[in-house]
């Protein structure tokens, strides 16, 4: 389904600090003009997936759709860079994403909240394996996971770190989350689970002083956590725009057959 866009949408161009992205921004601004975030109909993010995630974290609450163009090393969430931007915006297909909402408690008693569009990952901070218990909707499912850590990934993020950790690729719009252990030692046979998107997930670090654990929501890291609660956000939603010949749903599907 294509998204209705005005014939000459007002575009705010955003770019990573990389020289190719900065140069492209200047060229596009000279051709199409530029406006503020507040006045824009659409945001155009120039860079890689890392910059796209930073753009969503910074401007996601604005409600503006975001069209990304790949000028970085990784561009799963981006479109290819082309000159015919207005035509591509007219034909673009929207993908609506809900981020994960994370609440972390640290050893010192500090509570930290963050959003994640790709994944939330708990990781051991030292050479010693982490001990983590896993509760789903208030019920303990794993008394003690021993390993490097654990990931909760959205469908959009399931092809990234989650997939590298041998987690499942989730179809876009499936309203599911991937729960994937990282290098698990015990339970030996547990390889993760696919959860409904409205599941409340709670991790407790069982030996935080001897075996400290950090948590990262996309790129926001909090160290020395003792408890982490994750649920899908019910308040925030972002819209990414993709070229119809290679939309996000097709990209996720294609990743399952990559060799």
Swiss-Prot record:
Its EC number is 2.7.1.23. The keyword Nucleotide-binding applies. Coiled coil: none annotated. GO terms for biological process: NAD metabolic process; NADP biosynthetic process. Keywords: ATP-binding, Cytoplasm, Kinase, NAD, NADP, Nucleotide-binding, Transferase. It is an enzyme of class 2 (transferase). Involved in the regulation of the intracellular balance of NAD and NADP, and is a key enzyme in the biosynthesis of NADP. Catalyzes specifically the phosphorylation on 2'-hydroxyl of the adenosine moiety of NAD to yield NADP. GO terms for cellular component: cytoplasm. Pfam families: NAD_kinase_C. The keyword Cytoplasm applies. InterPro entries: ATP-NAD_kinase_N (IPR017438), ATP-NAD_kinase_PpnK-typ_C (IPR017437), NAD/diacylglycerol_kinase_sf (IPR016064), NADK (IPR002504). It catalyses: NAD(+) + ATP = ADP + NADP(+) + H(+). One of its GO terms (molecular function) is metal ion binding. The active site is at 49 (proton acceptor). It is found in: Cytoplasm. HAMAP family: NAD_kinase. Belongs to the NAD kinase family. This is NAD kinase. Gene3D superfamilies: Probable inorganic polyphosphate/atp-NAD kinase, domain 1, Probable inorganic polyphosphate/atp-NAD kinase, domain 2. Its cofactor is a divalent metal cation. NAD(+) binds at residues 49-50, 54, 118-119, 148, 156, 159-164, 183.
